[in-house]
Amino acid sequence: MSVPQPTPLRLDTLPDSNEPFAMKLSLSARIAEKFSAKREASISLATLADIAVENGYHALCMRASLIGIHTPRAEVLEAARMLRERGLGVSMVTGDFPIPENSDDGPTALRNITPYLDLAQAFACDLVRVALRKDEDIAWAQRAADAARERGMRLAHQCHNKSLFEQIEPSIDVLRRIGRANFGLTYEPANLELCGEPYGRATIERFAPHVFNVYLQNQRLHPAAKSLMVTWCNGNVPFDQIAVHEPGGIDFPEIMQTLVALGYDGTVTIHDASLGRPREDAARNAAYLRSLARFAPVGQSVAS
């Protein structure tokens, strides 16, 4: 009996030249935020951009702590110009605070998606992060995806606790119910682990047709951990946040090997929370992931 081949993961609209695969490396603005305050940046966008350039990142993943829908248009355009001059793209935009805070107001963006699309478009980015917490959000997600499609843009939901995307099969069912080709998933293994779900090769293959983006953050789960994650499906889970390059957490070698095997040529975003050492961790995380897989040459666009 033949085994069906998994659907290749693809983010790029065109094949990359001279590359068997060409993942791009993105640095999340989350590393620039204060550890316990997602609304406050501890370093400037210019400093974060310099760190990204110094360490061979292709893009930043933009968050509202630096630039959001609340930011004056002139400031947005100046930020976009600054990133272009540094040769950095923007891999995805999270345009407000309720989405990363995962509050009940997170899905509000779906009801008026235009400002989020405008913000992403200013950065020549076609991917916007959104949030769904209740079944009633699905119809709004369909409308928002339709509006995004008219502008050649896409929406993505992260694997995330306390959302409709906590578990594998329910996530796939929600994607099926939304039923829009431009609405997909940001694969993120740490939240899957917190929710008691497997996150390795079989999961990536299951999610493959829907993956628009990859987020990587790291953690250690143990009873004496300092942090507690509340989930709907797995109760309260103690964990310690650690940097991507630190051992004893998520199995990144398996994840990267699977992405390579599936021909993934999209963006891999280091989504570390700030541990008070953004420059050091950004450098060590990039070096670690490059030791696990081949990435596109620096200077190649995230949308090429």
What are these regions (language model features)?
Residues 45-52, 76-80, 113-117, 138-145, ...:
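Generic structural signal for well-ordered alpha-helices
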Residues 34-41, 63-75, 98-109, 132-139, ...:
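Acidic-and-aromatic substrate-binding clefts and catalytic sites of carbohydrate-active enzymes
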Residues 57, 122-125, 211, 264-265:
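A structural motif
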Residues 119-136, 157, 269-270:
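Active-site groove signature of glycoside hydrolases
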Residues 27, 33, 59, 93, ...:
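Acidic/histidine-rich catalytic cores of soluble enzymes
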Residues 88, 125, 153, 262-266:
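A short helix->loop->beta-strand "cap" motif at the edges of active sites that frequently abuts
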Residues 213, 265-273:
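Conserved active-site loop/cleft motifs that coordinate metal ions or position small ligands
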Residues 2-122, 149, 180, 286-304:
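N-terminal pre-domain/capping segments
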